């Protein structure tokens, strides 16, 4: 039911083109995944989202458990039917949100107890419970429950988080029973190379359908992100999709692809769009700026999104300045289209074996400067 096939390699880097088959369709990799935390990418319908070229969307177990609850989603026929999305879905376990957002009362080897931010009640979440919730939600891919240490953290604290993550992965694997849902493990280890190597080896030993690299983009220097990805990716199974969590800038995506990463997700494109910022030609454009007031050209002549095909910079400026919701939707659609087109262009370059030349300006040793 799940299959990952590699169709092309770059002859100069570890970049590859693949196809990840799921019960709800295929995901062509490398591929950026929009984030629909609460079963929606904010301000965008499922039909509009499909028009951006999105093939797989991420939703969040923590937030959906709090509201509306996995029972309601299951009664609706699962997350796909609940949100009207018939393509692949992935649910994050909620571990990152719990350790970064929630008011933690207790964390131990059994699990975590935290305060519900909506009503103040106590909630206990264990690896088993996290998997039960994700099985009820019914996404194509469920993520193992892990402990994501903050940055900075001491080596001893990161090592303890790794041991807990590995023990929890075993419990997640034992609990997960669905054949129509793939379980992905998560590599942790902070910025410590030996802990990353150890975690990669342990997670790979579970022989799961896919593996993610977690605990990056949590405040560490970008150079550490590059180093971690370059170190960990070659340690993961060649025949499984590799997912780099929380990465959504062009440079970071290009660098990660060169290291052999296949999947990415990030709230950046939609968050920027909701704040009036468009991603154009490697730059961030603030559409509130007066320079767009009388500019009747599209944001990007080559872009296929609704905003660029039907509207001008002046109109988008007008919408954003007047806080019209349509402006936020149009910019979110544009930004998502830009990210997805970028990964599609990378894919074509790998197939043509010109990735290392065409995307050299995005690599860390390039003098070219890109703001996103």
Swiss-Prot record:
Catalytic reaction annotation: 7-aminomethyl-7-carbaguanine + guanosine(34) in tRNA = 7-aminomethyl-7-carbaguanosine(34) in tRNA + guanine
The organism's place on the tree of life at top rank: Bacteria
Region (RNA binding): 246-252, 270-274
InterPro entries given in the database record: ArchSynthase1/Queuine_TRR, TGT, TGT-like_sf, tRNA_ribo_trans-like
GO biological process annotation, one example: tRNA-guanine transglycosylation
Record-listed Zn(2+) binding positions: 303, 305, 308, 334
Pathway(s) it belongs to: tRNA modification; tRNA-queuosine biosynthesis
Protein purpose: Catalyzes the base-exchange of a guanine (G) residue with the queuine precursor 7-aminomethyl-7-deazaguanine (PreQ1) at position 34 (anticodon wobble position) in tRNAs with GU(N) anticodons (tRNA-Asp, -Asn, -His and -Tyr). Catalysis occurs through a double-displacement mechanism. The nucleophile active site attacks the C1' of nucleotide 34 to detach the guanine base from the RNA, forming a covalent enzyme-RNA intermediate. The proton acceptor active site deprotonates the incoming PreQ1, allowing a nucleophilic attack on the C1' of the ribose to form the product.
Similarity remark: Belongs to the queuine tRNA-ribosyltransferase family.
HAMAP family reported in the protein's UniProt record: Q_tRNA_Tgt (MF_00168)
Protein name (Swiss-Prot/TrEMBL): Queuine tRNA-ribosyltransferase
Organism listed in the record: Prochlorococcus marinus (strain MIT 9303)
